[in-house]
């Protein structure tokens, strides 16, 4: 596997910044690429078809020998969201994640916390894969809270889908992301690295679309 796929012929190289591009490409060739022969690598993939019904998976993890097993359950609700080549959906779910779960007073997180489902609620939007996955996780919950977790989550999402989201909440999320991207504020990570990773979210799946998510910025 490693010998087949971990090869320059199956790699993506990008340069970021004000530079002499020819100089850097020559350097990369002389110090890296020239030592390999080009070869054809089939790294194609097929989309996973939607499930015909909800799938429930139960797994176990270890706790300390002297730790109680009470309130150590992690409940996770997950759904595939389109594909990463849909730029509007990609950005839209970043906004929704902020509004519904991450922002102060986020309504769905608040509903779950008010019901004391677990000790904390986390959400994630994994859009770095072809078929992005949105997840909601209740941490350190009780075993018997699974049904209530699903019920409250689906009820609140259905209510929001029907009644909509207050305009001020959406504007706050828009402002949050506009500031983040205009200022290239990626915390401890250099912006050149983060731009590259964001390019890969589409470039890996369509050679003609490396910049669709960068253009959003």
Task: Locate predicted features.
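Charge-rich, well-structured scaffold segments of protease-associated domains
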Residues: 1-52, 65-93, 98-217
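Short amphipathic
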Residues: 55-62
């Amino acid at each position: 596997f490693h010998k087949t796929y971990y090869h320059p012929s199956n790699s993506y190289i990008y340069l970021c910044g004000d530079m002499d591009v020819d100089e850097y490409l020559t350097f990369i060739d002389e110090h890296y690429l020239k030592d390999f022969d080009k070869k054809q690598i089939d790294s194609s993939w097929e989309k996973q078809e939607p499930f015909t019904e909800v799938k429930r998976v139960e797994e176990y993890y270890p706790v300390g020998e002297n730790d109680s097993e009470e309130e150590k359950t992690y409940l996770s609700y997950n759904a595939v969201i389109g594909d990463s080549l849909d730029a509007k959906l990609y950005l839209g779910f970043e906004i929704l994640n902020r509004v519904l779960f991450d922002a102060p007073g986020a309504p769905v997180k608040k509903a779950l916390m008010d019901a004391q489902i677990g000790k904390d609620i986390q959400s994630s939007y994994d859009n770095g894969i072809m078929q992005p996955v949105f997840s909601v996780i209740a941490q350190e919950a009780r075993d018997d809270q699974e049904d209530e977790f699903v019920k409250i989550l689906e009820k609140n999402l259905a209510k929001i889908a029907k009644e909509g989201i207050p305009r001020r909440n959406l504007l706050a999320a828009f402002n949050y992301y506009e500031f983040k991207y205009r200022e290239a504020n990626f915390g401890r990570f250099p912006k050149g690295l983060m731009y590259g990773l964001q390019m890969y979210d589409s470039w890996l799946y369509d050679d003609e679309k490396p910049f669709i998510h960068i253009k959003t910025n």
